[in-house]
Amino acid sequence: MRYRFPDNFWWGSACSALQTEGDSLNGGKSQTTWDVWFERQPGRFHQGIGPAETSTLYRHWKQDIALLKQLKHNSFRTSLSWARLIPDGVGEVNPQAVSFYNHVIDELLAQGITPFITLFHFDMPMVMQEKGGWENRDVVEAFGRYAQTCFTLFGDRVKHWFTFNEPIVPVEGGYLYDFHYPNVVDFKRAATVAYHTVLAHSTAVRAWRAGRYDGEIGVVLNLTPSYPRSQHPADVQAAHHADLLFNRSFLDPVLKGEYPADLVALLKTYDQLPACQPGDRQLITDGKIDLLGINYYQPRRVKCRDTAVNPQAPFMPEWLFDYYDMPGRKMNPYRGWEIYAPGIYDIITNLRDNYGNPRCFISENGIGVENEQRFVQAGQIHDDYRIDFISEHLKWLHKGISEGCHCLGYHMWTFIDNWSWLNGYKNRYGFVQLDLATQTRTVKKSGEWFAATAEHNGFD
């Protein structure tokens, strides 16, 4: 076999609570920011589809876990819903939620599938957002209590915990670029939200370590390598600034226990530093992780700015760089993202060379395609493009592992076609096709290919 992976390699996929569970307003669950935003502005959501039903995992969990086993998963990552487990954000636990999550965890283990559990995947309870969300340190403390509750309830069986999934995304979406609630454009508030998210992460890590639970705790970051247009110093500096803002603002605190000095100096120059309090530095140091999840979809290509900044305009990341459309790059036209498989190699070798080669795994990697019904043959979607996408990324991952990178697994996004926030079900990502009208599940060709790859621990 040409591409054989290490023994005990994690083969699986990932999803999140809000994107798959459905029953968003049932079972004792309170509203998240997404439920409220959809109520207020349904026209912003593709085809007017909100989070109420999604992929109905809440009702079909046993069937779906059987499909995971059929797809030869030995591991699977999903998230818990804070709004479902503790509807008021703090205080009483919802027994219906405890029962549901116990069923899911126990069934995964019964089928030989290791659960990887994320505490927060973009789904802020509205009662917490009304207090200011991550702008309010009271919400940081509440998250720590929520995390402790999760560890107490499920820590006897869950051995792989992740505090956040892609914590930079709610910062970008909610406070810079208007694709998450609360739809604010304000860099200073964005910096505060990012900083408090790191504090929330560290608070949860402290709680986990204090409980002396068996297993490991980490975080899932979407890492987008920043490539300069050229080696001209101005382009290189532009890429460095993009890397500081979008990658190292979370990567350095969770792996090194501190922020990059360059990032602190940069934010200070533009008067964008968040307010710090005594004890924050030690808290951040205490938030260093055991395991890093890496979500990789696309690179970020940048260049120095072609024009001067308008000094009257609000400060934004783009004051520091312009995006660069590299000629000839391979694109996914449905998502508008570049497909660049070597990026996965560059990420893990950077971790090896500059971050002490931490334990890590690919926690998401995938391709969303619109109107996959075009590719149905004999009742099955023949998504050869997804097989090609996965295999190319796995080849580069294999190369990094063979060169000493401590990468322990590969999880695809995603198991079943799911609800993708504002995009609804526009682009499909799953190994399993979901018919929205009937909720029928049908394994795609890529699912069969992945099952064979996982079973043989590699491919030719």
Regions found by a protein language model. Name each.
Residues 1-45, 88-90, 98-460:
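Active-site region of glycoside hydrolase catalytic domains
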Residues 74, 83-85, 122-124:
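A short acidic, glycine/proline-enriched capping/turn motif at secondary-structure boundaries
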Residues 80-93:
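Glycine-rich, proline-tolerant flexible connector loops at the mouths of alpha/beta enzymes
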